[in-house]
From Swiss-Prot:
Record's subcellular location: Host cell inner membrane
UniProt name for this protein: Immunity protein
Disulphide bridges: none
One GO biological process term: superinfection exclusion
Topology class, membrane: Multi-pass membrane protein
Length: 83
C-alpha cells in the first residue's frame, strides 16, 4: 500500500512538472533564442496560455520574434597591416 501511495505521489509530481514545462514552452523558446520580447512573452504566457489559442499565439511570437542578435546592425571591421 505504501508503494502505491509513493508511486502515485511521484506520478503527480512528474505530471505537474511536465505540465508547467509545456505551459511555459513559448517562454523557454524565447529565452533560448535570445528574443527581444522575452519579458512580454513571459507575462503573456502566464496570463493567456491557459487557452489553446493563447498558447499558440505566444508560441508563434516566440519563434518568429526578433532576436537581440538580429536587431544589431551588421558591422564590418577592417584591419590593415602597416607596410
Amino acid at each position: 500500500m505504501e508503494t502505491l501511495v509513493a508511486g502515485s505521489i511521484f506520478m503527480v509530481l512528474v505530471s505537474g512538472v511536465l505540465a508547467i514545462i509545456i505551459y511555459m514552452l513559448p517562454w523557454f523558446i524565447a529565452l533560448m533564442r535570445g528574443s527581444k520580447s522575452t519579458v512580454g512573452i513571459f507575462f503573456a504566457s502566464l496570463l493567456f496560455n491557459w487557452s489553446i489559442i493563447g498558447w499558440f499565439i505566444t508560441f508563434i511570437w516566440s519563434i518568429a520574434g526578433e532576436t537581440k542578435k538580429s536587431a544589431q546592425p551588421n558591422q564590418v571591421i577592417i584591419i590593415r597591416e602597416k607596410e
